[in-house]
Amino acid sequence: DIGTGTGLIALMAAQSNAQARIDALEIEPAACREAAYNIRISPWAERIRLYPQALQAFFPAIGYDCILCNPPFFVHSTPAPDNGRSLARHTGTLPHTELIVHAERLLTPHGKFQVILPVEEACQLIAYARRYHLFPRKITRVHPNPGKAPKRLLIQLTRQTLPPVETDLTVELSRHHYSEEYIALTREFYLKME
């Protein structure tokens, strides 16, 4: 999990796959402390290792079958005055181009790189990934509600050059009324999801 923040995605991955061993990277000290705490109190602590370092300095002895990332979204905007928030939201310390370079370096031959981005940034990332022989295998367009344009793309990149499987996911049918598909996808992660 690249840029784990408070560890949420790493914890969700551990909860979803009982065999998974997860390495989580985070460079922001306060977020790293919170991730360490969240991991420590979870039932999956023995399967998650937290590395307080940048992706660019991470050179494990193994490759990864799956790399997850919810990267900083904002490319050309004013950073937040709070440095921690800025690191989490802006691409200054991890441009999407570097994300691709390092994901390609860390993936096993049949590995998958899964990322969520706003539509425009996702399209740019897909185009750049092709230079590193990573191709979209799955693309899910995430719509906030019916009739609205997608706000995010969930992308799975692999070394396979097959045509991507494309799907749509609508989050809410109306305010706080979640779609059945979204409920089915997220139910195990919420205390109350209806």
Across the structure, where does each feature detected by a protein language model lie?
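Conserved SAM/SAH cofactor-binding pocket of Class I
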Residues: D1-P81
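SAM/dcSAM-binding transferase cores
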Residues: K148-E194
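Phosphate/oxyanion-binding loops and surfaces in catalytic or ligand/nucleic-acid-binding neighborhoods
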Residues: F74, Y132, Q160
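Conserved Class I SAM-dependent methyltransferase catalytic core
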Residues: L94-P150
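Short, well-ordered secondary-structure micro-motifs
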Residues: A61-I62, P79, L125-A127, R152
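Mobile active-site "lid"/loop adjacent to the S-adenosyl-L-methionine
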Residues: P71-E98
